[in-house]
Design a protein with these regions (language model features):
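Charged, solvent-exposed interaction patches on well-folded alpha/beta domains
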Residues: 1-139
Length: 139
């Protein structure tokens, strides 16, 4: 299971290909909720009908990287233009497009402890291994 989406009061769990494999009335700790995707219906054992099916490759890549670096994300948000924001409790991490996300997640593992208990947005959209450019905007 790669993640889940909320739909009509239930949680729809999907695999790496975006196929809905299970439904539940509650979320499962350790599996991120994916938000921001648009779809008009959900059918068990069929792919989620999203506009850009490639988003599931991004979701799988992101969840594997987060797991590899022991970063327990609560939600993964995709904006309409597929900009990624990771949500850890009350803190949001704006990652930007999924290009170079592995480099950003690698850097995030060292920054996340300092976000604990904070509300706001850590902006990593311009972050690279060379520039290490970030900013934090409290709520």
């Amino acid at each position: 299971v790669a993640g889940y989406v909320a739909y009509l009061g239930r949680y729809m769990y999907f695999d790496k290909d975006g196929i809905v494999v299970e439904t539940s009335e509650e979320g499962t700790p350790g599996i991120p909720q994916v938000t921001g995707l648009s779809f008009s219906h959900v059918i068990l054992h069929e792919p989620l009908p999203v506009e850009n099916q490639a988003v599931f490759e991004d979701i799988l890549n992101i969840t594997q990287l987060l797991e590899k670096h022991s970063l327990p994300v609560d939600k993964i948000y995709f904006s309409p233009d597929y900009q990624v924001t990771l949500i850890f409790g009350e803190a949001r991490v704006a990652m930007g497009p999924s290009d170079d996300i592995d480099e950003k997640i690698m850097g995030l593992q060292y920054m996340l402890p300092s976000l604990e208990g904070k509300k706001g947005t850590l902006d990593m959209r311009e972050y690279t291994e060379d520039t290490k450019m970030i900013s934090f905007e409290p709520d």
